[in-house]
Structures are given as C-alpha cells and as structure tokens.
C-alpha cells in the first residue's frame, strides 16, 4: 500500500465512518501532533475523536498528494450543524503508519462572502 493509499483508507474508515477500532493499523503509538488543540500520541488522538466525532464530521477529499514520506490532504469537512471547514492536513509516514501531523484549518467558510468569483474548493 502506498502512503497515499494508507491516508485515504484512514480517512474513510476513521473520519468518515467514525471507527477507531483499527487505529493500530494506521497510527504509531508515539504519533506527533502539531495542532495546538489536540494532544500527541495515539491515545491523545483517541481522546480528540471523542469530541470530534460528536460533531458528526464528513470529509470530502478535494486533493491528495504524496512526496516520499509526506502526504497532504486538502478537503472539505462538513459537520452535522452545517458548519463547513476548509482543511489541509499534512502527515509524515513512518514504517507504514501515520507518525506526525500538521494542519491548517479555515473554519465556517459557509459564512464567508468572497471578494472574488473563485470557488473555495
């Protein structure tokens, strides 16, 4: 499985099906998290999902790319309450598992009135 395929499978199973039962297949125990609002480690990710899954998120992947051990994912994250977030996640893969994560999030883009005619996604 390529690194990109690993991340696609992770998004489908974990984020879109809200299922962390196979997390050991995707994530290293010492997963490094760079988002300041989420704890590091696999157990930290499990804690994060308790809140995040309560929002009933759905990710629609717009772009995904792979460069060596780095995979980036640009996606639309729609929450049950109607909020739409524009997100770019970046992962470092090590030994076939997610080892490190960075992200950039633009929250509530449904409320933004663009000053241009370009699409947001």
Regions flagged by a language model, labelled:
Residues 1-121:
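C-terminal and inter-domain tail/linker signature
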């Amino acid at each position: 499985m390529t690194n990109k395929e690993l991340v696609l499978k992770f998004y489908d199973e974990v984020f879109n099906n809200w299922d962390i039962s196979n997390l050991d297949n995707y994530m290293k125990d010492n997963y490094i998290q760079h988002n300041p609002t989420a704890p590091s480690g696999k157990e930290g990710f499990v804690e994060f999902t308790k809140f995040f899954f309560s929002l009933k998120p759905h990710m629609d992947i717009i772009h995904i790319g792979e460069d060596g051990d780095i995979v980036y994912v640009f996606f639309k994250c729609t929450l049950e309450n109607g909020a739409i977030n524009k997100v770019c996640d970046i992962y470092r893969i090590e030994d076939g598992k997610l080892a490190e994560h960075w992200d950039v999030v633009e929250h509530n883009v449904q409320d933004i009135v663009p000053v241009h005619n370009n699409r947001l996604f």
